[in-house]
From Swiss-Prot:
It comes from Haemophilus influenzae (strain ATCC 51907 / DSM 11121 / KW20 / Rd). Pfam families: TfoX_C, TfoX_N. Required for DNA transformation. Positively regulates genes required for DNA transformation (late competence-specific genes) in association with CRP. Required for expression of the late competence-specific gene, com101A. Required for expression of the dprABC operon. Belongs to the Sxy/TfoX family. This is DNA transformation protein TfoX. One of its GO terms (biological process) is DNA import into cell involved in transformation. Induction: Constitutively transcribed, further induced about 50-fold on moving from rich to starvation medium. By CRP and cAMP in starvation medium. Translation increased by depletion of extra- or intra-cellular purine nucleotides in starvation medium. High levels of purine nucleotides by contrast decrease its translation under the same condition. Disruption phenotype: Does not bind transforming DNA, is transformation deficient. Loss of expression of the competence regulatory element (CRE) regulon required for development of competence. Keywords: Activator, Competence, Transcription, Transcription regulation. InterPro entries: TfoX-like, TfoX-like_gammaprotbact, TfoX_C, TfoX_N. The keyword Transcription applies.
Amino acid sequence: MNIKDEHIDSVCSLLDQLVGNVSFKNLFTGYGLFHKEETMFAIWQNKKLYLRGEGVLAIQLTKLGCEPFTTNELNKRFVLSQYYALSDQILRSNRLCRKLIILSIKQILEQKLECTLRKLNRLKDLPNLTIKHERALIKVGITNVAMLREIGAENALVELKKSGSGATLDFYWKLVCALQNKNSQMLSQAEKERLLKKLNEVWRKNGLKGYRKLDDE
């Protein structure tokens, strides 16, 4: 049966209406459904939509009546245990379906970020950071990526502030985005306001004076 001609276009269109930026690619086990052309969150095969989920999300899908992907009829050895066929209960509710898809996409992106950061060791190899930033962090005892991830951007800036090692807001933006594997110049004004509030809370808990506004250096 030609699944694409009969189903995949409409399936893709429906999912696009729910979360936006959905496309599909022909796979040897059916069709992969992608968000923003790079994050494969679902598979369409044999008139069933399989959503990717692991851990807590997998448990949630199972409780909602979703069956795990077992075998591919064309390739009996091909198994995708982290994909679950969405139940009628989910498919009847656009709101629930959208919620689960968003959770799946978020989980995949978090796993990719985890994998990327795990491969890095030197601080200067992170986005936005240079050898100058690395040296400043090493001076306060943060010697590698794993330690920075553990302590977090806010507490790292606390240590920099206490040691007088250039704890600026620009450094903070760079640290936050480095741990998200993205360019700090892409931060919006609203994101900076939210992060500033978070930073001030941590600083005050550590007996430091917080920033009153974004340009209050």
